């Protein structure tokens, strides 16, 4: 299974902790992430992560391309709903893309 990970800056530690807690399960799958999130997951878990560019410079577009080509089986996207930022549009774009291609997307620790 191909699992994609994205985390906004304020949620990167949460993503690290999540991946560390589920390291054994994640080790059986192909992991993909935007650049900085992927690097941090690798550092904490020692698992290999295929890394795209950072989201702010096109990594989110690379991520959506994988979804559109039906190469992503699920997405875990931790973002802070209390902060409006220039990256807010990527949340909606990736969410719409997942909905369009029937890819499950978790946006918090409980749904992940």
Language-model regions, residue ranges each:
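Mid-chain, well-packed structural core segment of small domains
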Residues: 59-100
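Histidine-anchored nucleotide/phosphate-binding helix
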Residues: 14-24
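Short, glycine-rich nucleotide/cofactor-binding loops
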Residues: 5-12, 81
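Short internal beta-strands
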Residues: 28-37
């Amino acid at each position: 299974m191909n699992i994609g990970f994205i985390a906004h800056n304020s949620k990167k530690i949460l993503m690290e902790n999540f991946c560390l807690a589920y390291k054994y399960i994640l080790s059986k799958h192909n992991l993909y992430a935007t650049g900085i999130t992927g690097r941090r997951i690798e550092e904490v878990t020692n698992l290999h992560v295929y890394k795209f560019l950072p989201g702010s410079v096109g990594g989110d577009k690379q991520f959506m391309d994988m979804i559109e080509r039906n190469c992503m089986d699920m997405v875990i996207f931790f973002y802070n709903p209390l902060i409006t930022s220039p990256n807010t549009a990527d949340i909606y774009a990736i969410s719409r893309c997942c909905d369009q291609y029937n890819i499950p997307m978790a946006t918090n620790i409980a749904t992940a």
